[in-house]
């Protein structure tokens, strides 16, 4: 574990947790404006479409979306650098997602990008996604550019 963190990711993860999601649930796209978090995500049970948006200052890929399927079956993990918004869609009846983070969650600095922002051009696997009211009221990428500018 220490070798992976120190040599490959060059990160000190200080916090770990699991979360669960049911089928057709989307959570995201979340980030913190201060106390930014680098994350490592993998799936202990089920299958998710994991999606990140680059919000880093002066990044050549600012505003670009990256998607990957993570599942118990494929045993892949995803390192998400600080400065990215993160979200995922759950494909199966029961999904358990495992996180490692290099900074603690602070609700004072939480924000996010709304899932259905057309400028992101995301093709969703379902038209019947379940999205929390909190996540339905996040800002667009254009509002982010005006209000927050970058991470």
Where are these regions (language model features)?
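Non-catalytic, conserved peripheral segments adjacent to functional cores
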Residues: 1-76, 94, 99-151
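Beta-rich strand-turn-strand
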Residues: 70-79, 84-89
């Amino acid at each position: 574990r220490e070798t992976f963190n120190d040599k490959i990711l060059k990160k000190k993860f200080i916090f770990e947790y699991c979360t669960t999601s049911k089928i057709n649930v989307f959570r995201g796209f979340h980030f913190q404006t201060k106390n930014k978090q680098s994350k490592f995500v993998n799936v202990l049970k089920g299958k998710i479409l994991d999606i990140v948006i680059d919000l880093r200052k002066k990044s050549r890929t600012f505003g670009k979306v990256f998607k990957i399927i993570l599942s118990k079956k494929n045993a892949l993990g995803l390192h998400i650098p600080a400065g990215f918004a993160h979200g995922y869609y759950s494909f199966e009846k029961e999904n358990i997602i495992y996180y490692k983070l290099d900074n603690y969650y602070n609700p004072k600095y939480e924000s996010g990008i709304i899932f259905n922002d057309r400028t992101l051009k995301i093709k969703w696997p379902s038209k019947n996604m379940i999205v929390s009211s909190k996540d339905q009221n996040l800002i667009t990428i254009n509002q982010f550019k005006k209000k927050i500018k970058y991470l």
